[in-house]
């Protein structure tokens, strides 16, 4: 009798729980979760089109299902963002999917559609996944055609493609003769696509605006420029914070490649701007040859990520299109570096070559340092030497500056660098004052600290 009462109680609780659960909760779809076994035996292509909006931010609806109820959430008057992942050698869902969906919905009430083609991307044979890219593009075209028939416009379509997903975006764009609004390619896949003609890969003609981020050009990514603007963080290789040896396991292979996604997500947070400097090469950027962005006035230098389309009008008008932008990042989110130009006018009679370390100190005691040690600088009498300094912290009010000069040599005499004028020019925040210091001597390997003063107008 007591046992019967116990089971009846459990049944009652179960009924109450089921009554309290909404219909929508029972119909939520999730990203396909596979494993290495699936990768070994292979998976046939099956695509879910997982829709998220502010009405269903935590409960995806699959628009690729027959008689899907998800279309009740699809408002074609909104902008639609497609997020398309790439090759999945182990079958696990991308770890960044939930974060990027949330960040998009925080910004605006988009239709966010996660293109889950994990069944098709999960395989140990990369070329099989690459062969499925056009099939995925065909499926996306059917959905977009459906949306257009309900009143959507191609202008409102924005595709964010990662690795192979970048080329899928390009294939979709080609089907509409480049009329879709925008494509962002996040480290487009290189293997099987490098050297291919435009019709077989992502190209700037695939959308009204195409911006691309390259973070693994010496590995899994595509090296050459593909968009109206191509960003090369840290030169497109060896991202800070990523493992340098194979002993780190799978992270060694995927960290650089994935960094493009995390840089993009950082741009959605709007903590700071990842400013790119248009330049011919990474070396030219490093030695300070590319800090002039007058061609974009009244705008500043372009920024990577979601807000890159603010520079669209300037970039698409170039003939031929194609701008490369370089910059360095920090190792961790939000990844920003804060750039300054450091100008030296010296009056030493002999030419000196060496390296500079500069520290900035704020009124509240914070300190940030930049070591300009990748390329030696040449200091000639009465000739200005300009160096690009990059700092991890953004110090608003600089109270003190310290500078160290070294030749890098451990033998021989110690040198002096006689400085007629040193000037610190902010590049990331160009509205801040330019600071100077006049007539001082740097002794090799001896740190010199001083209080900067506003530059004289004649020296700006």
UniProtKB/Swiss-Prot annotation:
GO terms for biological process, alphabetical: lipid catabolic process
One Pfam family this sequence matches: Lipase
InterPro entries the record matches: AB_hydrolase_fold (IPR029058), Lipase (IPR013818), Lipase_LIPH (IPR016272), Lipase_N (IPR033906), TAG_lipase (IPR000734)
Coiled coil: none
Glycosites: 67, 75, 177, 289, 366
Domain of life: Eukaryota
Protein's cellular compartments: Secreted; Cell membrane
Enzyme nomenclature, EC number: 3.1.1.-
Disulfide bonds: 242-255, 279-290, 293-301, 436-455
A cellular component annotation (GO) from this entry: extracellular space
Keyword annotations from UniProtKB, A to Z: Cell membrane, Disulfide bond, Glycoprotein, Hydrolase, Lipid degradation, Lipid metabolism, Membrane, Secreted, Signal
SUPFAM superfamilies named in the record: alpha/beta-Hydrolases
UniProt topology in membrane: Peripheral membrane protein
Cytoplasm found in the keyword field: no
CDD domains noted in UniProt: Pancreat_lipase_like (cd00707)
Record's signal peptide: 1-26
A GO MF label: phospholipase activity
Function, in words: Hydrolyzes specifically phosphatidic acid (PA) to produce 2-acyl lysophosphatidic acid (LPA; a potent bioactive lipid mediator) and fatty acid. Does not hydrolyze other phospholipids, like phosphatidylserine (PS), phosphatidylcholine (PC) and phosphatidylethanolamine (PE) or triacylglycerol (TG).
Record's protein name: Lipase member H-A
Biological classification of the source: Eukaryota, Metazoa, Chordata, Craniata, Vertebrata
């Amino acid at each position: 009798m007591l046992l019967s009462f116990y089971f009846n109680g459990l049944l009652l609780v179960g009924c109450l729980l089921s009554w309290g659960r909404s219909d929508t909760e029972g119909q939520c779809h999730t990203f396909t979760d596979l494993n290495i076994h699936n990768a070994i035996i292979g998976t046939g292509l099956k695509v879910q089109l997982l829709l998220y909006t502010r009405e269903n931010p935590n409960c995806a609806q699959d628009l690729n299902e027959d008689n899907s109820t998800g279309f009740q959430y699809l408002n074609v008057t909104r902008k639609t963002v497609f997020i398309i992942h790439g090759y999945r050698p182990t079958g696990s869902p991308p770890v960044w999917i939930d974060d990027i969906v949330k960040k998009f919905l925080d910004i605006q009430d988009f239709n966010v559609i996660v293109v889950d083609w994990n069944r098709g991307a999960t395989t140990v044979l990369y070329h099989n996944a690459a062969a499925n890219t056009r099939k995925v593009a065909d499926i996306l075209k059917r959905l977009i055609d459906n949306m257009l028939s309900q009143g959507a416009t191609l202008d409102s379509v924005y595709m964010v493609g990662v690795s192979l997903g970048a080329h899928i975006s390009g294939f979709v764009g080609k089907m509409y003769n480049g009329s879709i609004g925008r494509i962002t390619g996040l480290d487009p896949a290189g293997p099987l696509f490098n050297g291919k003609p435009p019709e077989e890969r992502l190209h700037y003609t695939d959308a009204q605006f195409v911006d691309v981020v390259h973070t693994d050009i010496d590995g899994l990514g595509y090296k050459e420029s593909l968009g109206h603007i191509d960003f090369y963080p840290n030169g497109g290789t060896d991202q800070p914070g990523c493992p340098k040896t194979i002993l780190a396991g799978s992270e060694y292979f995927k960290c650089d490649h994935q960094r493009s996604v995390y840089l993009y997500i950082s741009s959605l947070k709007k903590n700071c701007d990842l400013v790119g400097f248009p330049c011919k090469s990474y070396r030219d950027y490093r030695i300070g040859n590319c800090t002039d962005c007058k061609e974009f006035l009244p705008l500043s230098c372009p920024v990577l990520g979601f807000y890159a389309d603010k520079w669209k009008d300037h970039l698409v008008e170039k003939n031929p299109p194609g701008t490369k932008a370089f910059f360095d990042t920090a190792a961790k989110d939000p990844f920003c570096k804060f750039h300054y130009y450091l100008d030296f006018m010296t009056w030493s009679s002999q030419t000196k070559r060496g390296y500079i370390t500069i520290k900035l100190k704020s009124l509240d005691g914070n300190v940030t340092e930049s070591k300009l040690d990748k390329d030696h600088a040449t200091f000639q009498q009465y000739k200005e030497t300009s160096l690009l300094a990059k700092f991890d912290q953004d110090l608003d009010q600089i109270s003190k500056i310290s500078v160290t000069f070294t030749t890098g040599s451990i033998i021989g005499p110690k040198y002096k660098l006689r400085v007629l004028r040193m000037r610190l020019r902010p590049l990331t925040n160009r509205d801040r004052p330019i600071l100077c210091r006049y007539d001082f001597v740097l002794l090799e390997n001896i740190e010199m600290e001083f209080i900067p003063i506003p530059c004289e107008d004649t020296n700006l």
